[in-house]
């Protein structure tokens, strides 16, 4: 594997770490409703667990309400139960065939708790990015040892990977700041 291939591989893996972090952030409930909040909810559909998006249409009623409309009338109860049982503290209300999920306002204590959760998730994402940097640097050392590249190429490769690491860590920090602002906004 060459320096360029190693850098490209590392960048792709770092991008995947960022995507995973974005998905984790989307699960953190803020005071505002958004359809991504229910993405991880699993519904018992005739004996098998499937994502809620496969059995219902999810939309926004207003800024603080998610509307869920199951495609089959008899699934209303199962979908409502799945939303109630997910660990988001939501209390869905069924109105005919439509389930309305109001977002309860967050207490100050809960906001601070969520901020800590976000920071913890961010630290995990940063560690993943740094581990990828370490793996790339080990790969460069191995290439030098095998005489596939020069020490100058190794140094350049390490510098480039460090720049990528800095870029992705800064992106994580930016995402955390935005999410904290969103959480703390009353």
Swiss-Prot record:
One BP annotation, GO: cytoplasmic translational termination
InterPro entries: Ribosome_recyc_fac (IPR002661), Ribosome_recyc_fac_dom (IPR023584), RRF_sf (IPR036191)
Keywords: Cytoplasm, Protein biosynthesis
GO CC annotations on file: cytosol
Annotated GO MF terms: ribosomal large subunit binding
Primary location recorded for the protein, binned into one broad class: cytoplasm
Disulfide bridge positions per record: none
Compartmental location: Cytoplasm
Family: Belongs to the RRF family.
Function in brief: Responsible for the release of ribosomes from messenger RNA at the termination of protein biosynthesis. May increase the efficiency of translation by recycling ribosomes from one round of translation to another.
PANTHER family: MITOCHONDRIAL RIBOSOME RECYCLING FACTOR PSEUDO 1 (PTHR20982:SF3), RIBOSOME RECYCLING FACTOR (PTHR20982)
NCBIfam families to which the protein is assigned, alphabetical: frr
Protein name: Ribosome-recycling factor
Organism: Cupriavidus pinatubonensis (strain JMP 134 / LMG 1197)
């Amino acid at each position: 594997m060459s320096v360029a291939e190693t850098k490209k591989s590392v960048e792709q893996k770092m991008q995947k770490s960022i995507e995973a972090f974005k998905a984790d952030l989307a699960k953190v409930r803020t005071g505002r409703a958004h359809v991504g909040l229910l993405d991880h909810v699993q519904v018992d559909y005739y004996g098998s667990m499937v994502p809620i998006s496969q059995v219902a249409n999810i939309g926004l009623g207003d800024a603080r309400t998610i509307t869920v409309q199951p495609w089959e009338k008899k699934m209303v109860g199962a979908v409502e139960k799945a939303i109630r049982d997910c660990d988001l503290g939501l209390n869905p209300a069924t109105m005919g065939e439509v389930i309305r999920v109001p977002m309860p306002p967050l207490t100050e204590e809960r906001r601070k708790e969520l901020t800590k959760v976000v920071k913890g998730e961010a630290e995990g994402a940063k560690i993943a990015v740094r581990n990828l940097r370490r793996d790339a640097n080990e790969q460069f050392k191995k290439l030098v040892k095998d005489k596939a590249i020069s020490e100058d190429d190794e140094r350049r490769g390490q510098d480039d990977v460090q720049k990528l690491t800095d870029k992705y860590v800064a992106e994580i920090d930016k995402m955390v700041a935005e999410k904290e602002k969103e959480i703390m906004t009353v």
